[in-house]
């Protein structure tokens, strides 16, 4: 199979879909790999490293798109890339279609066979291709939130951990999954007061066992959320429905009751965000303020640390990519429910229930198409 990788064009996105080590793995399996020149520079991988690994360098992205059977990316294609879609092309990347109707329509119209990292699910219901970026985003959320609590950015002007004789910051984490747990780890490590909310008592028990007296755990409901937000200095939105639209737990009505200069980091923004006042921002212009609360809603947070995040992501993605390349997508889906769970569009049909529900579109069972 011909495998391709192009330079990411999203704002300040420096990750890359394939590393030189990934290229070696595909070449060893008998495939051909085509890399756009400069694709890996932002993550610290030179063109020469890709050539040494066995890849062919291509001068421009369009030629790579037109040449390959499977395109391996990091982030969703942008509108300028839609004309490069074609029937039968396998697109292997993050898609987040529940929050992006325009992209979904373009994939359906182009009859692209799109495999979304974020919906590929193992039998134990874990999300192996979402987990590494969730770990990084969770940790970054506290790092970024602490920065935007500084006065010059519109924050309260407080230090997360305080110093002797001053109060610590109150950190509230909405959602106790991978993002929330990693945010909790960093916030506790920095010495903040941490409260984490989740709808699952089992998950709260797990978090309590992990962090003990260092955190407070609460069942997530409107009353508890509203109560803890009044004293919050930093709020992390880390709610997830795999492939689906995120519930709006951080309501506009809470904002006037919060501290002036409090910070909200909406890590769920890729799936539409868990804040009613949330809209996507960029690394160039990451924050805005609503009713005195600073909102940080960057849609590609791990792109800020591309070396770490590229290696972490591709460590996970290469395994499934090799399975698809070896058998072809159709046969790979027949053999593996895990891979089939990642397929969001196939030959012009929408094959993910949560995405279909988010937009009111018809859902087609992938098994009926392969």
Identify the function of each model-found stretch:
Residues 2, 8, 77-169, 298-300:
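Glycine/serine-rich phosphate-binding loop and adjoining beta1-alpha1 elements at the start
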Residues 69, 75-76, 95-96, 221, ...:
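Short glycine-/small-residue-rich Rossmann-like dinucleotide-binding loops
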Residues 209-291:
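Rossmann-like adenosine-cofactor binding region
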Residues 2-110:
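An N-terminal-biased, well-structured beta-alpha scaffold segment characteristic
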Residues 6-42, 152-240, 287:
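Glycine-rich phosphate/diphosphate-binding loop of Rossmann-like nucleotide-binding domains
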Residues 118-159, 269, 274-370:
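Adenosine-phosphate binding glycine-rich loop
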Residues 33, 57, 91, 114-115, ...:
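Hydrophobic beta-strand scaffold residues
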